[in-house]
Amino acid sequence: MTEANTPTPPTPTPPVTNSAAAARLISSAPTSWKIRRLLWSMVQSTLYRYSFHTWSNWRSTLLRLFGAKIGKQCSIRRTSRVYYPWLLEMGDLAIVGDRAEIYNLGPVTIGDRAMVSQEAYLCAGTHDYTQLAMPLITRPIIIGSDAWICARAFVGPGVTIGNGAVVGACAVVTKDVAPWKIVAGNPAQVVKDRKMPPLPPPPLS
């Protein structure tokens, strides 16, 4: 290739120099959130984590004290982690397994009877990599009722998992999953429908 045909490299975007913008880059969270987050981290690392294995009601109470909306008879394992309790909502009989991580920089909703298995990761935040400042982007995650997030699966920001859907172990989900579908792989793809046996007829009165 001759010198005349050599493409000109693009001019790089200059780095952020404005001090206010740089400060926002370091942390965009309100001061009140930082204080609550600090208090919660102390509670989570002590009263929450070192509670008895069967004390889900106790852990539910601690989450509620920090603003979470927790339904009835939820099972929350002591080794699970929640980043911002006040951005978490769980329906009745929902389950969060051992070492599951709810990195809820944005709101996370877990529906009735939904299961988030061990070491699953719900990540409601990312960064805009098209800008050198890498500003934070938060998007809600919704896990529908009767859905199952299997072990070590990743669910990204802005994703809705439909009612009754199943996310296979170690799957990476960056797009919505329709109700009653089973997805697996990286990136997650639909592998089949989830078919349930018909409900028994109601008893005769």
Model features per residue range: what roles?
Residues 126-128, 132-134, 159, 193-194:
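Conserved catalytic-core motifs of eukaryotic protein kinase domains, centered on the activation segment
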Residues 53, 57, 65, 85, ...:
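Residues at secondary-structure transition points
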Residues 121-122, 128, 189, 197:
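Active-site/binding-pocket entry motifs
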Residues 72, 77-78, 83-84, 91-92, ...:
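Left-handed beta-helix
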Residues 48-49, 133, 151:
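A generic secondary-structure micro-motif detector
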Residues 129-133, 137, 198-204:
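Short glycine/proline- and charge-enriched loop/turn segments
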Residues 1-68, 72, 146, 186-205:
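Terminal amphipathic alpha-helical/low-complexity segments used for targeting or macromolecular assembly
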